[in-house]
């Protein structure tokens, strides 16, 4: 199992729209593609409170490539993204990392 850590930095004043898009659309679209989120977090204390951090679980890099590519091509995703950004972009930056658990990690 590998994990992908993704951090979305929302534009100022746009975090609620980003959270709504994930809650109302993104997660259910992921379900149809077999994408497995393990958790979602917002920053309470840190350098920015405009961040949504989440983690996805993958069996392999090949699975990640296949399922993420299918998600990005999904018309339902394009519609949800376009509607959520009707009055302007909501994301300033996205970063991601592919993580491999250590032998002593609770998540393997």
Task: Set out the residue ranges of the language-model regions.
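A short, polar/proline- and glycine-enriched secondary-structure boundary/capping micro-motif
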Residues: 17, 77-78
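Short amphipathic alpha-helical segments
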Residues: 14-40, 72
